[in-house]
Swiss-Prot record:
Keywords: Cytoplasm, Endonuclease, Hydrolase, Magnesium, Metal-binding, Nuclease. This is Ribonuclease H. Endonuclease that specifically degrades the RNA of RNA-DNA hybrids. Pfam families: RNase_H. Residues 1-141 form the RNase H type-1 domain. It comes from Xanthomonas euvesicatoria pv. vesicatoria (strain 85-10). PANTHER family: RIBONUCLEASE H1 (PTHR10642:SF26). The lineage of its organism: Bacteria, Pseudomonadati, Pseudomonadota, Gammaproteobacteria, Lysobacterales. Its cofactor is Mg(2+).
Length: 150
């Protein structure tokens, strides 16, 4: 099983507002950057999209260490998801889970991989986190300025 290191981030100019996401995948000394955005989104949606797109890009089962500065993503997938599924996509308080379609997509994308979800403090000097932060922010700016290609 291949070992892949993944770094993800999402960005939003306003919340909601133009959004961008980015992922850096590292395998055997090689790197691949992924990035995209939406004209109107939220920061949480962009954080989810970064993880989804990184995992959906992989064509075979992998051992992954996924670094995110989003507690929402890390806790959602590692702690909250089982309860949401048991309660038919309701929170502990009985409300519908926000971004359900993205959570379902992320859940599906995780099934064939072994993933170690790691939280990294954002804007704290981690070079890979800073790199994906810049990529995601540039995508959000491109969305805002009408320059987006994705």
């Amino acid at each position: 099983m291949k070992f892949i290191e993944v770094h993800t981030d999402g960005s939003c100019l306003g919340n909601p507002g133009p959004g961008g996401w980015a992922a850096l995948l590292r395998y055997n000394g090689r790197e691949k950057e992924l990035a995209g955005g939406e004209a109107v989104s939220t920061n949480n949606r962009m954080e989810l999209m970064a993880a989804i797109m990184a995992l959906e890009t992989l064509t075979e089962p992998c051992q992954i260490v996924l670094h995110t500065d989003s507690q929402y993503v890390r806790q959602g997938i590692t702690e909250w998801m089982p309860g949401w599924v048991r309660r038919n996509w309701k929170t502990a308080g009985g409300d519908p889970v926000k971004n359900r379609e993205l959570w379902e997509r992320l859940h599906a994308a995780t099934q064939r991989h072994r993933i170690d979800w790691r939280w990294v403090k954002g804007h704290n000097g981690d070079p890979d986190n800073e790199r994906v932060d810049v990529l995601a922010r540039n995508q959000a700016i491109a969305q805002r300025d009408g320059l987006a290609t994705s």
